[in-house]
Regions:
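Proteins synthesized as precursors that undergo proteolytic processing into mature forms
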Residues: 1-87
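Cofactor-centric catalytic regions
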Residues: 65-120
């Protein structure tokens, strides 16, 4: 959870073993620092460095929606890159809710899983 200087309160999380902190850091960075809309912050392509639940390799795993030039460049730099499905469950499932200062609740859910954001 995070209480921001502008009055927003954000709760967010993900499942996904050792990938959880990577997913949560990406989600927070996209939404708070880069100003990406909440749902898009969760839906954008993900990466995972190392092993996570159900995975046996320590490679750099990228969802297939990354640009081919990006994937090629990472390989040129010596990374062991493994390209997964466009929306891979190996990247975990994330969700977030933001309460804005005016009381508006904004929710987002992961297209990699079944779920919905609902509030009242």
């Amino acid at each position: 959870a995070a209480r921001l200087n502008d009055g927003r309160v954000m709760v967010y999380g993900s499942m996904g073993g050792d990938g959880q902190p990577q997913t949560q850091a990406a989600l927070f960075t996209r939404y708070i620092l880069q100003g990406v809309p909440l749902q898009e912050s969760i839906s954008r392509p993900r990466w995972l460095l190392g092993r996570t639940w159900g995975q046996s390799s320590d490679s750099l795993k990228l969802e297939g929606r990354f640009a081919p030039a990006c994937i090629a460049r990472l390989r040129e730099l010596g990374h062991d890159v493994e390209v997964l499905a466009d929306f891979s469950e190996a990247m975990g499932h994330a969700g977030a809710i933001v309460r804005h200062p005016n009381g508006l609740l904004e929710g987002a859910t992961d297209p990699r899983s079944n779920g919905a954001a609902a509030g009242y």
